[in-house]
Swiss-Prot record:
This is Threonine--tRNA ligase. Homodimer. Catalyzes the attachment of threonine to tRNA(Thr) in a two-step reaction: L-threonine is first activated by ATP to form Thr-AMP and then transferred to the acceptor end of tRNA(Thr). Also edits incorrectly charged L-seryl-tRNA(Thr). Residues 2-60 form the TGS domain. Belongs to the class-II aminoacyl-tRNA synthetase family. GO terms for molecular function: ATP binding; metal ion binding; threonine-tRNA ligase activity; tRNA binding. The lineage of its organism: Bacteria, Bacillati, Actinomycetota, Actinomycetes, Micrococcales. Its EC number is 6.1.1.3. InterPro entries: aa-tRNA-synt_IIb (IPR002314), aa-tRNA-synth_II (IPR006195), aa-tRNA-synth_II/BPL/LPL (IPR045864), Anticodon-bd (IPR004154), Anticodon-bd_dom_sf (IPR036621), TGS (IPR004095), Thr-tRNA-ligase_IIa (IPR002320), Thr/Ala-tRNA-synth_IIc_edit (IPR018163). GO terms for cellular component: cytoplasm. The gene is thrS. It comes from Micrococcus luteus (strain ATCC 4698 / DSM 20030 / JCM 1464 / CCM 169 / CCUG 5858 / IAM 1056 / NBRC 3333 / NCIMB 9278 / NCTC 2665 / VKM Ac-2230) (Micrococcus lysodeikticus). It comes from the Bacteria.
Amino acid sequence: MSEPKNILLTVDGELREVTHGTTGLDLFREKPTTAVMRVDGLLWDLAREIPAGASVESVDITEPEGLEVLRHSTAHVMAQAVQQLRPGAKLGIGPYITDGFYFDFDVDDPFTPEDLKQISSLMQKIVKSGQAFRRRVVDEETARAEMADEPYKLELLGKKDAADTAGEGASVEVGAGEITIYDNVDRKTGDAVWCDLCRGPHLPSTKLIGNGFALTRSAAAYWLGNEKNKQLQRIYGTAWASKDDLKAYQERLAEAERRDHRKLGAELDLFSFPDELGSGLPVFHPRGGIIRKEMEDYSRRRHTEAGYEFVYTPHITKQHLYEVSGHLDWYANGMFPPMHIDEVRDPETGEITRQGQNYYLKPMNCPMHNLIYRSRGRSYRELPLRLFEFGSVYRYEKSGVVHGLTRVRGMTQDDAHIYCTREQMKEELTTTLNFVLDLLKDYGLNDFHLELSTKDPEKFVGSDEIWEEATRTLAEVAEASGLQLVPDPGGAAFYGPKISVQARDAIGRTWQMSTIQLDFNLPERFDLEYQAADGTRQRPVMIHRALFGSIERFLGVLTEHYAGAFPAWLAPEQVVAIPVAEAFNDYLDDVVAKLRAEGIRARLDDSSDRFPKKIRTAAKEKAPFVLIAGGEDREAGAVSFRFRDGTQDNGVPVEEAIERIVKAVREREVTP
């Protein structure tokens, strides 16, 4: 039976009749910036024929999914250029990542900055030549024959059915479905000039890449992210829909570098990372300690007002606790090795006369909070019970991923665990989310969206029914908030789904902040109960909640958000008083004393430095308020304000100046 000449499609929401064999290139010829198409919800190359009855949408290169395809295609062009310049280079993987892409290579020598320039220059020629990306479906035998000289591709073919768990980026190359190879095809001859094992999709032509790409750096990387594997050389790059978009991104990067909390932490004398302590273990200096204490003190106050009760737990515990909780089954790789202690041996024979025990540094506070709940009988009248702790936890992070304060090995979590009835669950989740958002706003973050992390089918405890109920409840609470909700399939911890609050900072970057996790499983594992109103014993629901994530990480984020210019209530030094000349030291010293009496952190700069240098020093230290006084000020009983932005307010009466400063601190105003 012959194929029908015409078929019906839904194209960008409109029903259309087209000829059989129509491709995305045919449909979207009038939309030259279309990167790929979405066919029944899946991304396809534009060159593919569209089946009858399909729903088809164009995806522009400026859209998030379009940018991902652009970056993936640019990674292929980069790999082609590398193999032209270094014919012996073996291909690893080359996925898109946030704002960019990378490709791994097995090469004899690391790439140099000069190499990156040559690669980039050749990429520009490939882009201008307008090579087509051609998709081919092949069987495994054909794929192995074509990839015979690419050992890493052959390894991936062997992991085809488990690519999602095979390692970093493997799922970009192969998966449980078809095996596909993408050719880069010379426009003039029609010959394939380069190919790679890849699931795609890709742009229709290299010309669509344009000139909005750049190679950023090279680094060593273990194959599939496993440090037991061979170390390869990785080239990172970024790609955007236009040169202007690339320039804007590079400007954001430069601004992010200026705001880097590691640099500012050293410049402002806030914290450091002594080699003697080890990777990921920061120490806070007095100035940083002030900020941290202010953060903690305000958080404690707000938690007290919200009905939380404070608890304290130790830093180590016997192994059995984490066997009960499931952490040793599901989280062992994130824990430090055990300490084996209390073993006794006969001094003469060396034989063990008393068995020792394994103790672990705690990676999480929840098991210990469960023990507090279980320490006595509980009644429904006590619920919801909200336990809160600034609890120190220790997590083994590979040295390569440790990063300043935002990825550490020893951290302090503002950790709360809420125990409630199922009837209270939804209201408590709503209250908790609102509390989290309000408190983050008090610290100066105001732009949020939510992410819902759901079950990893390979890594969870409890029944599917319990997970479905927990996920549904969290989704309802998140949607009721009115904030954008983004799915994160498989991103939950092993014991329950979670909402995470994503906050946008001053330069538009998104940070994961607070997490709210619903858990029916740990109460079961710890046999937690309460006596219900009808006298029966019931299982409570447990809500895990970390507001800052960790104190360390949150301080790192705030340092970059404010570029070190903290609002007055958080600033280590809130006021620096600078006399125009030494003769006015005593006058300003009296002003400083009055400010200190109001609880303001104020200092008189009576150093021997000249006046201009004192002003520069205060600006460098990012003091919120600089008070200046000379002869006219003393005669009028006034001071002059100098603000961070260089503006001044002269001749302000001392009492008014003190009142303004106290108000700014107590009302947590953002100072200029």
